[in-house]
UniProtKB/Swiss-Prot annotation:
This is Flagellar assembly factor FliW. Keywords: Bacterial flagellum biogenesis, Chaperone, Cytoplasm, Translation regulation. The lineage of its organism: Bacteria, Bacillati, Bacillota, Bacilli, Bacillales. Acts as an anti-CsrA protein, binds CsrA and prevents it from repressing translation of its target genes, one of which is flagellin. Binds to flagellin and participates in the assembly of the flagellum. The keyword Cytoplasm applies.
Amino acid sequence: MNIETKYHGTVQLSQLALVSFENGLPGFEHEKQFALLPIHDSPFTILQSIQHKDVAFVMIEPFSYFPTYEIELDDATCEQLKIQKENDVALYVILTVAEPFTNTTANLQAPVVINVHERIGKQVILTNTPYKTKHRLFPETVEAK
């Protein structure tokens, strides 16, 4: 299957690259099918709609940048995504890419949870959490005078 993408042009996909989001993503409820497109030699992955090329999100697995990040999924989410054990899950967070890149932030309050075996996912909005929608990827640095 070939699709047009925002960042990679035309891409040929295997079924293994596809992930279904039963309810879409918040704000993009009509987008149900996405492809996971890793950016080679980088920690970034693109979550690309297969229906609309301009609907694409830059994501990372959060643990390299936020080593203490942890979430607990409720039973309803685990049931919806058919999660039985921890290694069923891939966890990503969506980035807001900024210029300069050092100002890029990650949305830790709404991770994208994917069952890697069933190829189904959901963006989970966490409540009662210290996480916010904008956490800097790179700590602010103070320039020496």
